[in-house]
Amino acid sequence: MESPDKGYRRINDDLRHDHHIHVNDKRILRICRAKSIQSTIKYSNHGCTRRAKNPQFVAENLLNRDFHADMPNEKWLTDVTEFKWYEGMTVHKVYLSAILDLYDRRIVAYVVSDRNDNPLVFKTFDRAVKANPGAHPLFHSDRGFQYTNRTFHHKLEKAGMTQSMSRVAKCIDNGPMEGFWGILKRERYYRKRFTSKKELVNMIENYIHYYNCRRVQRGLGVLTPMEKHNLFLAA
């Protein structure tokens, strides 16, 4: 089972998507209760990035919590989150930078690094641009130091993108991106102890592939992000 921590709604979605079996949510819930099947509990997300101390550039919140998009590459969200792995009593960290498309909720590009620095964010952006030539989305982030860096703003301008930033300490302004972090960590990270960097990075890479290509979402009409994306391209 790709995701043994699925709740009854996701189990029902998989039955519809993979096996064309249509049953009521309540029936699946009764079966899950009878078999003691439970989803992973939801943890609070405390990963909101703080405002840069000396921002070189600050953009207005042009997105303004309008998380609807009519086509791919219309609106991109981005953020950085951290993970820990353990070597005996020593705690190590890795950082994941990712860009999410609001139309199909696919992860457009991502980079994992030992350092939370400008190159991490710049490399993620460069990968997204390379994979989507000609894309000119509204590009939304929080006010972390990488995104308020003037060099990064110039990279956005050169790519023909408009920059948007969340208000200070308003994580909900970047809600779907924060939501993706929560999904990833709830399904693959929390309640686990990683004892090597390779194991942790493999988990992240495998999960992003699973999320894009195998994990259906009701908000996408019980499709995966890539199915939603490809349907638009084929229309």
Model-identified regions with their sequence ranges:
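Conserved, non-catalytic sequence blocks in retroelement Pol enzymes and Pol-derived host proteins
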Residues: 4-5, 20, 67-68, 86, ...
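Mobile genetic element proteins and their domesticated derivatives, centered on retroelements
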Residues: 11, 28, 32, 63, ...
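An active-site-proximal beta-strand-loop segment
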Residues: 65-108
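Retroviral integrase
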Residues: 74, 106, 114, 126-130, ...
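Active-site beta-loop-alpha junctions of metal-dependent nucleic acid enzymes
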Residues: 92, 111-132
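C-terminal domain-tail junction helix/linker
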Residues: 157-161, 183-235
